[in-house]
């Protein structure tokens, strides 16, 4: 492992807790280990699985889904979304202070890397269950560590350890986010907006957007002062290869056979106009603070 990535794991380890006994851990000699002797090996690809058992991550996105995501994101199609998240993170950061950026269900670390590019004093941890994703997340950024853990369950982090928590298109446990978020820390959540991929839902049989998603977020995180809501909206022109990757990297891939997807994509024009509509919500943890009115902005991006 390169020295800078070794240092990233050492820095992040100070915020970690053993998933078995909840004790502090140290990184060294190719493993993460607590005082009671519970140890978790550093995989050859550079990530550490901190599930409660000794085995590595066994669920999460498949290797095919991760490869499709890497190709699609690598082509820059969602770069405006990543840039918007990074800009919001920069606004919420407090005067260049160091701290931990925790990316829950962070996949390949794509969004975490963009945030760390602008928060140059901070280190990051990408948490995911997919071994295929973690292999890539381990190389996503010199100041990021990749950790195998379940975002739905108790996280292997100390109380109040995260200066910033990211949840981008993934599952989240509100109680655990509250536990690990530091006083004065910030939370950024990105979810699909109502028009996201609307041109593809019928022709390709994609999973629909939950109409109650915004209401559920308000219920789950209503105790935080609202720092803002940004709607990132733009259109892409996607050829059939990119279109296939877009579907193959997301949850609809679990419900559409590869052959059926190929047939449906082949029936569409080439290229296809696709709407990107992403709602980015940001919150700050201020114990005892009064609720504030939510500031709303719409970011239109020409592509």
Task: Give the positions of each predicted feature.
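N-terminal auxiliary segments of SAM/dcSAM-dependent transferases
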Residues: 1-59
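Conserved Class I S-adenosyl-L-methionine
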Residues: 12-14, 231-303
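Class I SAM-dependent methyltransferase Rossmann-like catalytic core
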Residues: 58-83
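Conserved alpha-helix/loop element of class I SAM-dependent methyltransferases that forms part
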Residues: 75-97
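Class I SAM-dependent methyltransferase SAM/SAH-binding core
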Residues: 100-102, 109-154
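A short acidic, Gly/Pro-enriched loop at the edge of an enzyme's catalytic core
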Residues: 153-164
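A short glycine-rich, Lys/Arg-flanked "PGG" loop and its adjoining helix->strand segment in the class I
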Residues: 174-186
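Conserved class I S-adenosyl-L-methionine
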Residues: 186-216
């Amino acid at each position: 492992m390169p020295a800078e990535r070794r240092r990233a794991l050492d820095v992040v380890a100070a915020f970690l807790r053993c998933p078995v006994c909840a004790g502090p851990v140290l990184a060294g000699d190719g493993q993460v280990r607590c005082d009671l002797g519970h140890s978790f090996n550093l995989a050859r690809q550079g990530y550490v699985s901190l599930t409660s058992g000794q085995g590595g991550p066994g669920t999460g996105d498949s290797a095919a889904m991760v490869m499709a995501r890497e190709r699609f994101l690598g082509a820059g199609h969602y770069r405006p979304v990543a840039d918007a998240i990074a800009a919001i993170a920069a606004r919420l950061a407090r005067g260049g202070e160091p701290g931990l950026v925790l990316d829950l269900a962070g996949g390949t670390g794509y969004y975490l890397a963009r945030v760390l590019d602008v928060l140059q004093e901070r280190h990051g941890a990408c948490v995911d269950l997919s071994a295929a994703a973690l292999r890539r997340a381990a190389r996503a950024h010199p100041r990021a560590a990749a950790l195998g853990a379940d975002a739905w369950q108790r996280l292997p982090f100390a109380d109040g350890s995260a200066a910033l928590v990211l949840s981008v298109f993934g599952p989240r446990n509100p109680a655990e986010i509250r536990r690990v978020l530091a006083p004065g820390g910030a939370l950024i959540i990105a979810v699909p907006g109502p028009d996201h991929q609307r041109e593809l839902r019928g022709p390709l049989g994609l999973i629909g957007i939950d109409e109650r998603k915004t209401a559920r977020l308000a219920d789950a995180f209503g105790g935080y002062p609202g720092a803002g809501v940004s709607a990132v909206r733009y259109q892409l022109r996607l050829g059939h290869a990119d279109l296939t990757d877009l579907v193959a990297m997301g949850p609809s891939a679990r419900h559409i056979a590869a052959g059926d997807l190929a047939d449906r994509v082949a029936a569409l024009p080439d290229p296809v106009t696709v709407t990107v509509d992403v709602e980015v919500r940001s919150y700050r943890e201020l114990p005892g603070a009064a609720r504030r009115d939510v500031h709303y902005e719409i970011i239109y991006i020409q592509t």
